A protein has these predicted regions:
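An alpha-helical interface "stripe"
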Residues: 1-188
């Protein structure tokens, strides 16, 4: 419903193509290309666009908890799924601080169970960013193994490394420009 409405809004003169584009996307998501076909469609603006990158306010953003990704008997439910114009483009897995196994367990689950499972291919192909956090300071054993903190990865066939979110202070200022310009607000 959201996808259809946004497609028609962003593509005047192409409203009648909505259903065919939707079918094409569903087909592309089953391809064994790590989502390359879908990504190319996503960033394209011709002949139709799925996201308005020029005017972000023309897009609709939603999120939900425990969105089920199911194919046959196989399923997984990311803790949080983020949607842009009705497309589930990002998911977030959040763990309790000091959870057993830390982020190593989550990395293993993704790399051993989800990425290699062909039934999950369509979900991995549409997901542009995966975020994992246990709301703790970084500990990555010298950058080798993600133990705790917030990490991200993108789709893979069998194994994707977890990467740290870092804002470099290239100018060596007392307060990094990112933190100065975008002050974090207390959520308590």
């Amino acid at each position: 419903q959201v996808f259809e409405k946004q497609f028609k809004k962003l593509n005047p003169g192409h409203e009648g193509e909505y259903l065919q584009v939707f079918k094409d996307i569903k087909k592309e998501l089953n391809d064994d290309d790590l989502g390359r076909g879908f990504y190319n469609r996503l960033k394209s603006v011709s002949p139709v666009k799925l996201i308005d990158f020029e005017n972000i306010k023309n897009n609709v953003f939603h999120f939900t908890a425990e969105f089920t990704c199911k194919n046959g008997q196989d399923e997984f439910r990311p803790d949080i799924t983020l949607f842009v114009n009705g497309l589930p483009l990002c998911f977030v897995e959040v763990k309790k601080p000091n959870n057993h196994g830390g982020m190593v367990a989550e990395s293993s689950r993704m790399n051993r169970e989800r990425f290699p499972n062909k039934k999950f291919r369509r979900f991995i192909n549409i997901t542009q960013l995966m975020i994992f956090s246990n709301n703790m300071e970084y500990d990555a054993l010298g950058g080798i193994v993600p133990i705790q903190g917030a990490f991200y990865c993108t789709g893979a066939r069998s194994s994707a490394p977890f990467n740290c979110f870092r804002e470099d202070n290239i100018s060596q200022q007392k307060i990094a420009p990112f933190h100065q310009d975008y002050v974090y607000k207390d959520i308590n």
